[in-house]
Amino acid sequence: MSRVSQARNLGKYFLLIDNMLVVLGFFVVFPLISIRFVDQMGWAAVMVGIALGLRQFIQQGLGIFGGAIADRFGAKPMIVTGMLMRAAGFATMGIAHEPWLLWFSCFLSGLGGTLFDPPRSALVVKLIRPEQRGRFFSLLMMQDSAGAVIGALLGSWLLQYDFRLVCATGAILFILCALFNAWLLPAWKLSTARTPVREGMRRVMSNKRFVTYVLTLAGYYMLAVQVMLMLPIMVNDIAGSPAAVKWMYAIEACLSLTLLYPIARWSEKRFRLEHRLMAGLLVMSLSMLPIGMVGNLQQLFTLICAFYIGSVIAEPARETLSASPADARARGSYMGFSRLGLAIGGAISYIGGGWLFDMGKALAQPELPWMMLGIIGFITFLALGWQFSHKRTPRRMLEPGA
């Protein structure tokens, strides 16, 4: 085995271990924020939506800057610094009793993510061969789902005692992750050249097809991020207990672990990537529409199952499409910019969704936010269809098995 192949194989295992620590640290805390501050402390959902939207926008919206800096200085210092900054954000969240302090903690958490997320994604592009990326992204997503349910279970258990324990656990996990990277991550360059920050950003912005695709995905993310805000609140409202939220993540884990990799393997040989993305988005949109009209957990969990199945179909294709055009001279910049749709869609959906949720309750129309999300999903579906049919996408982005 050549040294390059050996480095790639070792890199895969490193990425998987690192990803598990990050996912556990995140999901111990974030799914419970809405339960803690809306249900336990009585805050308006829009206040928590602003906090979650701020974290999303800072982390993903500034990702191109974090990626460009990592292209210039390498992955390791950015990742370690970002992990420690997120740990500080979680520690601050544990003592938040006013909205401004929650917002500040989410700002710190998002800024940390800005530093570590783009270089971690760029390492995947660097270490995983193009023909293997779809399957590797599926493995990462299976791991995400398992880590999400384990993290949510642990966080729900700790929440019975004290929210500060929840935040302390998340902070400790990110400190461990920082130490893991500081100890074992080689000083790898992300790009084939030490690209200046401005040059990396220029290369991304000149790729109009990629920019259009990323911005169109904002509508997709408006649906996807509600697993952190309105879905947990809805489950808690119907069940009458925050303990039921863990079953929502258990459903996601079961579906992902049993279906994600087989569906990815089966569909990559039969359908183009853009068809898989659009099919998954359509299922997600259809499942969102009736959520506000359900009256029991069985109906709600059935719709959540359908939503997760749509995500299982769409996510590997979306990740592969986002990684395919990355210029080897500016990998960090490309992967940072690829998160901009999540920044825009997530921020709008968290703040707007929280506001619509409060308004729906006030007007006795709980279906209002869910109908709006379903409509946004359909508009995004049509926009992606127009883009893929009118703007010729490179064959390597579309071919089965690309």
UniProtKB/Swiss-Prot annotation:
Q: Name one GO molecular function term.
A: transmembrane transporter activity
The record's section on CDD domains has: MFS_MdtH_MDR_like
For this protein, the parts annotated as crossing the membrane are 13-33, 99-116, 139-159, 165-185, 214-234, 244-264, 277-297, 300-320, 340-360, 368-388
Q: Listed GO cellular component terms?
A: plasma membrane
Periplasmic compartment segments? 34-98, 160-164, 235-243, 298-299, 361-367
Q: How does it sit in the membrane?
A: Multi-pass membrane protein
Q: Which UniProt keywords apply?
A: Cell inner membrane, Cell membrane, Membrane, Transmembrane, Transmembrane helix, Transport
Cytoplasmic topological intervals? 1-12, 117-138, 186-213, 265-276, 321-339, 389-402
One matching Pfam family: MFS_1
Query: What InterPro entries does this protein's entry cite?
Result: MFS (IPR011701), MFS_dom (IPR020846), MFS_trans_sf (IPR036259), MFS_Transporters (IPR050171), Multidrug-R_MdtH (IPR022855)
- Provide the family line: Belongs to the major facilitator superfamily. DHA1 family. MdtH (TC 2.A.1.2.21) subfamily.
Q: Identify this protein by name.
A: Multidrug resistance protein MdtH
Q: Tell me the classification of the organism that encodes this protein.
A: Bacteria, Pseudomonadati, Pseudomonadota, Gammaproteobacteria, Enterobacterales
* Name of encoding gene: mdtH
